A protein has these predicted regions:
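Bacterial N-terminal signal peptides
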Residues: 7-17
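Positively charged n-region of N-terminal signal peptides that target proteins for export
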Residues: 1-5
Length: 221
């Protein structure tokens, strides 16, 4: 809801470097034009990235239930930025909703099949809403020393057909042509009209708060 293109988060680190370089000295008009010319493109490496959502057990008999840890296996991301600018040209993420699946070993294989079926069909309605997307609208960058940057990324998160503005704190490391972004944030299930799963005649149900975490690797193309 892996919420999970996420490689975009990492790009803000490069924006910070570009802004610092621009502030460091005057540039001629021709040089400025060259800086604003070609956009740098980074694409998410899904095989090396992780995007998970934790749902917590609640209700009067919450102690009889288990938390859920749902991971996405299919997601794509791309970020484009203009060197020397503090605003990327585009920053997007798309997660295939049907790829989200329970990962906790506390559940049996058969239980996971039931959970995943309910998640896909009733909770996310993946056939009707096949993608969960994030599109950036604003970003602020704070260098944290060395190749580490702390970023606040604002954008539109669309889940189950509902779009909400969401601010995500991210720690980004930039080394060579590779960007790595890590972070976590909370969303409310009710904000996106996501129904709660329940057991024991409704005495155990998923809480409203969901925690989204990610560890994203992206490479410059």
């Amino acid at each position: 809801m892996r919420l999970g293109k996420l490689s975009a988060f990492a790009l803000a680190a490069l924006l910070a470097q570009g802004a610092a370089a621009a502030a460091g000295g005057a540039r001629g008009a021709a040089g400025g034009a060259r800086r604003q010319g070609a956009a740098a493109v980074y694409r998410l490496d899904a095989a090396r990235s992780k995007f998970v959502i934790r749902a917590f057990a609640g209700g009067p008999l919450w102690f009889k239930g288990h938390d859920h840890l749902v991971a996405a296996s299919e997601f794509t991301g791309e970020a484009r930025l203009t060197p020397g600018s503090v605003s990327p040209a585009s920053l997007t993420l798309a997660v295939r909703a049907a790829s989200l699946a329970e990962t906790r070993e506390v559940f049996t294989v058969e239980q996971k099949k039931i959970i995943n079926g309910e998640l896909r069909d009733a909770v996310l309605e993946a056939d009707k809403y096949p993608e969960i997307t994030f599109r950036s609208t604003d970003v602020s960058v704070e260098p944290a020393g060395g190749d580490l940057f702390r970023i606040k990324l604002g954008g539109d998160l669309t889940l189950r057909g509902v779009t909400r503005h969401t601010v995500i704190p991210v720690e980004v490391t930039l080394r060579g042509g590779e960007l790595r972004a890590r972070g976590e944030f909370d969303i409310k299930r009710s904000d996106f009209k996501v129904p709660a799963t329940a057991a024991f005649h409704g005495t155990v149900r998923v809480r409203d708060r969901l925690k989204v975490s990610f560890d994203i690797v992206a490479r410059r193309t």
